Design a protein with these regions (language model features):
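Residue-level detector of beta-strand structural context in well-folded domains
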Residues: 1-3, 53
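Short, structured motif recognition centered on aromatic/hydrophobic residues
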Residues: 3-5, 10-14, 62-66
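N-terminal intrinsically disordered, cationic/polar leader segments
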Residues: 9, 23-26, 32, 40-52, ...
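A hydrophobic alpha-helical transmembrane-helix feature that marks the membrane cores
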Residues: 13, 55, 108-109
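Extended intrinsically disordered, low-complexity coil regions enriched in Ser, Thr, Gly, Ala
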Residues: 15-35, 75-88
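Surface loops and adjacent helix of pleckstrin homology
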Residues: 15-17, 24-25, 67-69, 98-100, ...
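Mid-chain, well-packed structural core segment of small domains
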Residues: 51-88
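C-terminal charged interaction modules
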Residues: 80-127
Length: 127
């Protein structure tokens, strides 16, 4: 699962396997280790008690909650993106969830074997 942070926006991109994990377990989590026992954890978790995608932050944890119904629909269909803006002090935070497509032009060092096939790729092509 990839996390992109830019300004007042968070974007998570999930591979096919991560979508399957969300279906089976209700969550997907990654972590980034830093020096001196500091680790940033980011998690996407299904929640039956919410009605909109919601992001929270506590010490070293970014958690994005997705409504259970929206999660099940997103995972089971060809829908690529879910988005929501939530109010935060001083403005809005835009949260985007996307299925991660393989690039049209392969990049060195990138394993995209579990990414979704790119919709603009030639027929029969993995990219």
């Amino acid at each position: 699962m990839k996390l992109r942070i830019k300004g007042s926006s968070l974007r998570l991109r999930l591979t096919q396997g991560e979508i399957q994990q969300l279906v089976e377990t209700g969550e997907v989590q990654e972590q980034v280790p830093f020096a001196a026992n500091a680790t940033l954890v980011y998690r996407l978790r299904r929640d039956s008690k919410i009605s909109d995608i919601t992001a929270t932050y506590t010490v070293n944890l970014i958690e994005i909650l997705i409504p259970e119904r929206a999660s099940r629909e997103w995972c089971a269909t060809d829908r690529v993106t879910l988005e929501h803006s939530q109010r935060v002090p001083g403005g809005e935070l835009r949260v985007t969830l996307e299925k991660d497509f393989a690039c049209l032009a392969p990049r060195a060092g990138e394993d995209e074997s579990d990414n979704f096939p790119h919709p603009q790729a030639p027929p029969g092509s993995r990219e």
